Amino acid sequence: MKIKVNGEEKKIELDQENALLSTALNYMGYKPNTVVVELNHLIINSMIWEKVKLKDGHNLEIVSIVGCG
């Protein structure tokens, strides 16, 4: 499946059954409690990432949260 992540096209090896947002984020190495995800211009609540299916051509913007003191 090909999706756009932060403006760059990426090929992710997930079949349609496992093409969940949570699975894709894990595959790409993101930690769920440290990112905010926008899918096709809508911010997706992390509580439903396991229910959101990705499709070819979807656009993800992923912002990592970094704490500093």
Model-found features: residue ranges?
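Ubiquitin-like/PB1-type beta-grasp interaction modules and other compact soluble beta-rich domains
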Residues: 1-68
